[in-house]
Amino acid sequence: MFAIVEEPLDVGVLIQDAQRPDCGAVATFVGTTRIDESEGAAVEYLEYEAYRPMADRKLEEIGAEIEGRWDVGHVSIVHRLGRVGPGEASVAIVVAAPRRGPAFEASRYAIERIKEVVPIWKREVWSDGYVWVGSQIGTRDQVSGFR
């Protein structure tokens, strides 16, 4: 499953869907909103936006990259859009593999690739302002065709 959703993530369902009789490992990565006071104020929430047509395609491409590189039986990547409060999940990656090494490596690869190539942008919102953060290649306007 590769999806971009606007509702809270149900990681339990993703783990259940990943279980296979030929896989002895299920590695899960869940990215959550943390209260980070590095900018002088606590983060109240994160807000995610995406260029949907490309983001959907890029998640599927990452899944194909993983399947071509590691011996895995299942890959799920789900990213949430909209407002995500402290402690809530914004991204879930679940990889099932015959052995734990490939499962861990593939899940780490997935989150790093998401940050590199998937056009999803995060806005950190504090009580006194906000900032857009991210390291994707290109800006929101460049990816969506606006200048």
Tell what function each PLM region has:
Residues 1-90, 96-108, 112-147:
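N-terminal, polar/charged subdomain of small-to-medium soluble alpha/beta proteins
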